[in-house]
Amino acid sequence: MDIGLREWLIVIGIIVIAGILFDGWRRMRGGKGKLKFKLDRSLSNLPDVDDSPELLGPARVVNREHEPSLSENDLPPVTARESSKKRRQDEPYQGDLQLSTEEPVPTLLDPVVGDDDDLQERPQKEQAPVEEVLVINVISRDPHGFRGPALLQNILESGLRFGEMDIFHRHESMAGNGEVLFSMANAVKPGTFDLDDIDHFTTPAVSFFLGLPGPRHPKQAFDVMVAAARKLSQELNGELKDDQRSVLTAQTIEHYRQRIVEFERRQMTIKQR
């Protein structure tokens, strides 16, 4: 049976994310990373496809008669300056998870690095392997893809900072402090970004992803991730896709939230044993 373009896109997306997760897991094993991921062995057996970046352009849209299109009111707002009366308490703005407004703001392009003394004083917690990964892809409608300077400016405004594994991370604080809420990788292998060549950088797509277990408040972190992806798609002419590269609908967003609820329920059950 012939494999179509859509299937290749899905396979390539899985390979990219799997590679990033494996690198994070390897760094954690070496004591240098903050993220620890448990990879499915089956992903390592996938064939290595050296397709050109053009294959990761906008994918064929699957018509879903029973799924409504994503509207302005379906996703959380993207700016922290709008009135808080219009939002639900469980859908924070992008700046709501800041630890402190008095914290010094680091240089935006510098990798976020913790203080060595603080790291030595804090008890080392063994993080559980990631069991689930929630993914939102943003695919450029422009045949030339997202251009580096515009992409960088957009994600910096959303609070993402360049850091470990040469990808971008959104921390609790917009200043780049606190735990990692979610990350953003290049959808083209090897999934990294080169800030030294950002002026000439282009990519057909990027992938936002959140691992479970991960942030202490995964539902709020997920809403912030949706807001960042939505902002990027609106301002840079992109299209939101789910982990299967299908159009991201309000129903898909709700399904992701339900996965978080179910995961938290399982965690509570395990703790009560």
From Swiss-Prot:
Pfam families: ZipA_C. Gene3D superfamilies: ZipA, C-terminal FtsZ-binding domain. Residues 1 are periplasmic. One of its GO terms (biological process) is FtsZ-dependent cytokinesis. Residues 23-273 are cytoplasmic. Keywords: Cell cycle, Cell division, Cell inner membrane, Cell membrane, Membrane, Transmembrane, Transmembrane helix. The chain crosses the membrane at residues 2-22. It comes from the Bacteria. GO terms for cellular component: cell division site; plasma membrane. It is found in: Cell inner membrane. Its main location: membrane. It is a single-pass type I membrane protein. Essential cell division protein that stabilizes the FtsZ protofilaments by cross-linking them and that serves as a cytoplasmic membrane anchor for the Z ring. Also required for the recruitment to the septal ring of downstream cell division proteins. Belongs to the ZipA family. Interacts with FtsZ via their C-terminal domains. PANTHER family: CELL DIVISION PROTEIN ZIPA (PTHR38685:SF1). This is Cell division protein ZipA. It comes from Stutzerimonas stutzeri (strain A1501) (Pseudomonas stutzeri).
